[in-house]
Design a protein with these regions (language model features):
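Helix-loop-helix
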Residues: 2, 11, 15-17, 21-23, ...
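Intrinsically disordered, low-complexity regulatory regions of eukaryotic regulatory proteins
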Residues: 25, 200, 206, 503-506
Length: 515
């Protein structure tokens, strides 16, 4: 009875303790600090440095690094220390959004930062040189999408048109470097197309396997690309400033992880089409987001996901549990058959199948649920990784501030290991020591080995596995009780039948003696 109580008690304590994480969190404000001519901006996912010298973006540092990712500086020519966040800049580097051309100002004045919304920050840089007045407005959001919106307002007070170039950076082609990609009419490539061969220029940027640094161009803009004598490729977009007019250009920079759903959300889905694995994950991610919107907490979303999964798989798991329990109870008979027919494997297999048929069990019945649950586990793992930004910005659960990162205290790792050991103990309650010794100890060692090698997996995955294993162990306990009760009833019936036969034999003997 103690076994049966331990599992629901652990699950109940987990649910009650998680109640504190039910409420949604308020929008997080963006922090900033003005240091000399620079302003440093910190969001939940990245760190930025803007400068009044050119009104440029000098650094985009991805400090949030979920499992399988690493911190990264995206601006060419900038190096960021992961510990101190101190920056070093290459001499002569071209920073994103520097404006070059006829009379473009080199120095700007930073206005007072404003907050259009609690989780937004608006920076405005104003510069003037001659007849050109330039205003650059950067809008940052504390969300999961790594975007910086830019509005460039060009006022030309002169009598001549001005040709301007808005640069995203410089690029030195070399092995292992990021790829320079242009997008025209929704198709990405490394070449700049002739003006007459496309309808719209969508943008330009740098891509590697993990990150994307891509500028969505303003409507009607044209690509810009120049190769310097040193071999550097300067790239960006061209802007027109007609005489006596004020023009406004709206652009958007995506500087973040290379994740299809994030990029699709900001209109860059065609830049990186998902593979088969990503397509399989999309429904799982969308379902998790649906549960999150219902509960406002990814911890509860994972709990509901686990419960729904266990309910759907209940018939299969029930059959698996019965099959495994019966198999354990048949071990003595199986061993006798194997010893008896060890010299004739064909006959041994025939006798084993006869025993399985007599007991009404299929030795392969336990495989199907395992084959179904493993892909679910893998898909959930990938879904948590691909939803890491949303999870990072959501409220914490229990002691876990971020379910996309590892458990800092390894509590879930230890609990899951203990529940797995308990489940293994429930699976081998009747096996004789000689038969089950190696199997039993292997079953106890495996959870420990798993914990040692996978301890740094996302806490959300450990939460799912803990709940799923706990529910499976509870279900196995109930199956063991059902089978034990059935065997007791069968044994009682057999004993009663035996007593009846003995009484019948005794009566026949008395009759014969009387005759």
């Amino acid at each position: 009875m103690r076994k049966s109580r331990s599992i629901p008690v652990c699950l109940l304590l987990l649910v009650l303790a998680g109640a504190a994480g039910w409420a949604g969190s308020a929008d997080r404000p963006i922090a900033y600090e003005v240091v000399g001519r620079d302003i440093r901006v910190e969001t939940a996912l990245a760190s930025y440095v803007f400068s009044a010298d050119g009104g440029v973006l000098k650094s985009v540092y991805l400090g949030f690094a979920p499992y399988g990712s690493s911190v990264a500086e995206l601006v060419p020519g900038t190096r960021t220390d992961p510990k101190t966040r101190d920056r070093q800049y290459v001499a002569g580097a071209i920073f994103p959004f520097v404006l070059e051309g006829d009379g473009a100002p080199a120095s700007y004045v930073l206005g007072e930062p404003t907050r259009p919304a609690p989780s937004e920050l608006l920076l405005e840089f104003r510069g003037q040189a001659g007849d050109l007045v330039i205003v650059k407005r950067y809008l940052l959001r504390n969300d999961a999408y790594y975007t910086v919106d830019l509005e460039v307002v060009v006022e030309n007070r002169g009598a001549k048109d001005a040709a301007l170039r808005l640069l995203l950076g410089s690029y030195l082609p070399k092995p292992g470097a990021r790829s320079l990609v242009y997008q025209f009419d929704g198709v990405a490539g490394e070449d700049v197309l002739a003006e007459a061969s496309y309808r719209s220029f969508d943008g330009v940027g740098l891509l590697d396997k993990q990150t994307v640094f891509f500028l969505k161009a303003a409507p009607g803009a044209a690509p810009f690309r120049v190769t310097t004598p040193a071999g550097d490729v300067q790239f960006g977009t061209s802007l027109a400033a007609k005489a006596g007019t004020t023009s406004s250009y709206e652009l958007s920079l995506y500087g973040g992880r290379r994740r299809f759903l994030l990029m699709e959300h900001v209109g860059l889905g065609k830049l990186d089409a998902p593979g088969i694995g990503a397509r399989l994950m999309i429904p799982v991610i969308q379902f998790l987001e649906l549960l999150y919107r219902a509960t406002r907490n990814f911890g509860w979303a994972i709990i509901l996901f686990t419960l729904l999964t266990r309910i759907i798989l209940f018939p299969l798991v029930q059959k698996q549990s019965h099959s495994m329990a019966k198999m354990q109870r048949l071990q003595p008979q199986l061993k006798k058959l194997q010893e008896r027919f060890k010299d004739d494997r064909q006959l041994m297999q025939q006798k084993l199948m006869e025993l399985y048929k007599k007991e009404g069990m299929n030795p392969l019945a336990g495989c199907l649920p395992l084959l179904i649950q493993l892909p679910i586990l893998i898909l959930l793992w990938k879904a948590i990784l691909y939803s890491a930004e949303q999870i990072h910005l959501s409220p914490g659960f229990l002691w876990l501030s971020d379910l996309s990162l590892m458990d800092p205290y390894f509590i879930l790792v230890v609990l899951t290991t203990l529940v797995m050991i308990l489940q293994q103990w429930l699976l081998t309650p009747t096996m004789p020591g000689e038969t089950s010794g190696s199997q039993k100890y292997l079953g106890y060692i495996f959870p420990v080995v798993m914990a040692v090698f996978l301890y740094n997996f996302p806490a959300g995955l450990w939460l799912y596995y803990f709940l799923s294993t706990g529910l499976a162990a509870g279900q196995q306990f109930l199956v063991n009780r059902q089978l034990a009760h059935a065997e007791a009833v069968r044994a009682a019936a057999a004993a009663a039948a035996g007593e009846g036969e003995e009484k019948g034999d005794a009566t026949d003997g008395e009759r014969q003696a009387g005759n």
